[in-house]
Amino acid sequence: CTKGFDIKLEPGKTILDKDIILKPSDIYTMSKVILEETCVKRVGCMSGPNLAREIANQHPAATVIASKFEEVIREGESAIRSKRLQVYSNHDIYAVELAGVLKNSMALAAGALGGLGYGQNAMAFLITRGLGEIIRLATAMGADRQAFLGLAGIGDLVATCTSPMSRNYTVGARLAKGETLQQIIETSSEVAEGIKTVSISKKLADSTGIKLPIIQYIYKALFEGLNVEEALRYLMEYRWGYDADYM
């Protein structure tokens, strides 16, 4: 399953250090780690709008199994497909992994909107422009944009951004209500992957010149103490330009 991505750093360094410069080749997804650090030659991943509680309660759902190897996809499908879980395939494992990771940043922002009490217009705005940032960043990292228009991309993004059950949504909501990131981390029993995702994405954007205004201001709210309402004000004043400019 897609749980996140990471980078290799020198001892004593952190992603928040200002002198860290990231290139797309510095980013490690789970499959890349497995292929480089073990003897495994065939890997796959599962990603999609798969909120665990709903699946456990037998609500209808669908997922994507991605692998370069057809036999890995077939094996995964035979293991999990049921009358309540539909399975789709994709051969671009890297894009599917990135889709599953990058959506967590937008879930933080969605939670912040929810915490401020805003409605569906604001959420639709965020999801649509957030998808654009995800696609811009992922294509700069070498992924194909097609996967982001399916279940693993827009499907997972919608589910995660609209569900209070999402860990990342919860962090964003608490941040909007005045808690600091440190307070949230100290009182949370689960890890919100979006926190690290935001820091890596922002650093990569700084290094490559990719415009990611939503991620930039989520970062400022998380790590630099910017008030969430103030972050939203900056985004509402941002000159977005052409609609669907990521296609």
Give each language-model segment a name.
Residues 5-7, 96-97, 190-191:
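Short, small-residue-enriched loops and turns at beta-alpha junctions
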Residues 1-2, 46, 90, 184, ...:
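Short beta-strands and strand-loop turn motifs
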Residues 33-43, 60-147:
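Internal alpha-helical scaffold of NAD(P)-dependent oxidoreductase catalytic cores
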